[in-house]
Design a protein with these regions (language model features):
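Terminal amphipathic alpha-helical/low-complexity segments used for targeting or macromolecular assembly
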Residues: 1-148, 153-155, 160, 166, ...
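Residues at structural and domain junctions
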Residues: 11-14, 18, 110-111, 149, ...
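Generic signal for short, ordered secondary-structure residues
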Residues: 11-12, 103, 107, 140-142, ...
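Glycine-rich hexapeptide-repeat left-handed beta-helix
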Residues: 32, 197-349
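Short glycine-/acidic-enriched loop or helix-start segments at secondary-structure transitions
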Residues: 66-68, 191, 207, 317
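Acidic, glycine-rich loop-and-beta core segments that form the ion-binding/anion-interacting portion
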Residues: 151-231
Length: 349
C-alpha cells in the first residue's frame, strides 16, 4: 500500500536568495504546491508520524523536484529503510519512515545543493537557467542561443516569439507571439506581437504591435503605441508615444504625451526639468518637430503643429500652427574686395 508523503520545509539563512526572478524558497513552494507541506524553523519541530513518509528539505535547495522525492520514497520502501539521506548526510535533506528500518543510507543527486556558497550559487543558477530555457523551447519559443540568453522564471513568452542572443529578460515581462528581441535588457515590460527590440534597455515599458525599438534606445516608464519607430540613441521616459509616432535618432522625450503620427526630429530635447520640478509636455497628433528643437516644459503643441529646426519653444503652439524661434542667418563677405584669398590661415611657403 502506498504511504502518503509529508513535506517539511526547514528555514535557512539562504532561502531568500534571489535566482532568476524568484527566491530559493519560492521555487520549492511552487514545486511541491500539490503536497501536504509545512514550514518549520528547525528540524526539531518536525512531527514524524507512523504510516507515512516524512520528507525534510531545507528551503535553500531550489533545484529539488517532485521526481527527486518520489524516487527517494520508492527507494526507502523497496529497501525497507528507516532514514534515507538525500544528497548526502551533510545536505540536511532526508526521508524518514517512523516505523524503523535500516539507517545510514544516502542517495546522491545534483539537485540537493544548497545556495550557501558562491560556487553552489553558480551551479544552481545555471541549472535553473537551463530548466527555464528548456521549458521555453518546449513551448515553441525560439531561443537561438541559450548559452548567451538569460530569462527570469517570472517571464512569460508566447510560442512563436524570437529571443536572439545576448538578451537578459527579467521581472514581470510578457513577450507576445511574433515579437523579436535581440541583445537587449528588458525588465517588467510588455512587448506586443510583431514588435522588434534590438540592442536596447527597456524598463516598465509597453511596446505596441509592429513597433521597432533600437539599436541603443532606452525606454523607462514608457508606453509606445502601434507601428512606432524609436531609433538609435533615443530615450523615452515616463511618456506616451502615440500610434505611428517616430523618433529615428538622438532625442530625449521625457514626461511627455506625444500624439500619433508625430515626427520627432534628430537632436530634439523635451526640457522637462527646471532645476527643482519636473513638468510635462503635450504634443498633438501629426505634428512635425524639426531637428535640434528644444521644447521647454510646461508647453503644448496642437494637432498638426510644425516646429522649425533649431527652435526653442517656450510658448504653446496652436493647432496647425508654425513655430520658429532661432537667430536670423546673416551672410557676410569673408575678405575685403581685392585681398588675396587665404583659407589656410598661415604663411605661404
Amino acid at each position: 500500500m502506498d504511504m502518503p508523503l509529508k513535506i517539511w520545509f526547514v528555514e535557512s539563512g539562504h532561502s531568500e536568495r534571489k535566482l532568476l526572478g524568484r527566491s530559493a524558497e519560492e521555487y520549492l513552494l511552487r514545486e511541491f504546491s500539490a503536497f501536504d507541506t509545512e514550514k518549520v524553523v528547525s528540524e526539531g519541530e518536525c512531527r514524524f508520524e507512523e504510516g507515512r513518509l516524512d520528507v525534510v528539505i531545507p528551503l535553500d535547495m531550489p533545484l529539488v523536484t517532485v521526481g527527486d522525492v518520489e524516487r527517494g520514497a520508492e527507494y526507502v520502501k523497496k529497501h525497507s529503510l528507516g532514514v534515507l539521506a538525500l544528497g548526502g548526510a551533510a545536505s540536511g535533506a532526508k526521508i524518514v519512515r517512523s516505523e524503523g528500518g535500516r539507517s545510514g543510507y544516502f542517495i546522491s543527486s545534483p539537485h540537493f545543493v544548497k545556495v550557501d556558497s558562491a560556487k553552489n550559487v553558480r551551479l544552481v543558477y545555471n541549472q535553473l537557467k537551463e530548466r527555464i530555457t528548456d521549458r521555453l523551447l518546449e513551448a515553441g519559443v525560439f531561443v537561438f542561443d541559450p548559452a548567451n540568453t538569460v530569462v527570469d522564471d517570472t517571464v512569460r513568452i508566447a510560442a512563436g516569439a524570437e529571443i536572439l542572443p545576448f538578451c537578459k529578460i527579467e521581472g514581470d515581462t510578457v513577450i507576445e507571439a511574433g515579437a523579436s528581441v535581440e541583445g537587449s535588457h528588458i525588465s517588467d515590460c510588455r512587448i506586443e506581437g510583431g514588435a522588434k527590440v534590438v540592442m536596447s534597455h527597456l524598463a516598465d515599458t509597453r511596446v505596441g504591435a509592429g513597433s521597432t525599438v533600437g539599436p541603443f534606445a532606452r525606454l523607462r516608464g514608457a508606453v509606445v503605441g502601434k507601428g512606432c519607430r524609436v531609433g538609435d540613441f533615443v530615450e523615452i521616459k515616463n511618456s506616451v508615444f502615440g500610434d505611428g509616432a517616430k523618433s529615428a535618432h538622438l532625442a530625449y522625450i521625457g514626461d511627455a504625451d506625444v500624439g500619433g503620427g508625430t515626427n520627432v526630429g534628430c537632436g530634439t530635447v523635451f526640457c522637462n526639468y527646471d532645476g527643482k520640478w519636473k513638468h510635462r509636455t503635450s504634443v498633438g497628433r501629426d505634428c512635425f518637430i524639426g531637428a535640434n528643437v528644444n521644447l521647454v516644459a510646461p508647453v503644448s503643441l496642437g494637432d498638426g503643429a510644425f516646429v522649425a529646426a533649431g527652435t526653442t519653444v517656450t510658448q504653446d503652439v496652436e493647432k496647425d500652427g508654425f513655430a520658429i524661434g532661432r537667430s536670423r542667418q546673416v551672410n557676410k563677405t569673408r575678405r575685403a574686395e581685392g585681398a588675396e584669398k587665404d583659407f589656410g590661415g598661415g604663411d605661404k611657403a
